[in-house]
Regions:
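N-terminal auxiliary segments of SAM/dcSAM-dependent transferases
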Residues: 1-37
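Conserved SAM-binding loop
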Residues: 106-107
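Conserved SAM-binding motif I beta-strand of class I
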Residues: 92-97
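A short acidic, Gly/Pro-enriched loop at the edge of an enzyme's catalytic core
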Residues: 129-138
């Protein structure tokens, strides 16, 4: 993808770089057991949109960002904010997180709900995988 510095293998909606940092992997193990925030069994586009609209900061940011923007969410976890920012826009949203288990939930939700303008990167925040000055908002 055009936001990556180097090519990474892609599995569905997730680009993957092996996370090697010992401290980061401790965090990964924690969130493996307790993904946050998790999805409810009845969550869909409308429930995520409702949750996002109730959050003042996310709602105002989505309005401020407008359209045709490249937006990066660092530490996206299960991707609920990334997905919220993608719903109803033509923005390109990228969520980055070291926890593959959380990203699997995010990618699965996006695919199940036909949200095509969001992708995810499984990498450490300190990995140099993103192009400089590509994103309009972080």
């Amino acid at each position: 993808m055009e936001f990556l510095k180097t090519e990474l293998p892609k599995y569905g909606k997730i680009y993957k770089k092996e996370v090697l940092d010992e401290n980061t992997n401790k965090v990964v193990e924690f969130y493996k057991e307790s993904p946050f925030p998790n999805y409810k069994s009845d969550d869909d586009k409308s429930t995520i949109l409702e949750k996002g609209n109730k959050n003042y900061l996310t709602h105002e940011f989505k309005k401020f960002a407008g359209f045709k923007k490249n937006i990066l969410e660092v530490g996206c976890g299960t991707g609920q904010f990334s997905i919220y920012f993608a719903i109803g826009t033509n923005n390109n949203i990228v969520g980055l997180d070291p926890t593959i288990y959380s990203l699997d939930l995010a990618a699965s939700f996006a695919e199940k709900n036909n949200i095509n303008n969001v992708e995810f990167i499984n990498a450490d925040i300190f990995d140099d995988v993103l192009k400089d000055e590509f994103f309009d908002f972080l």
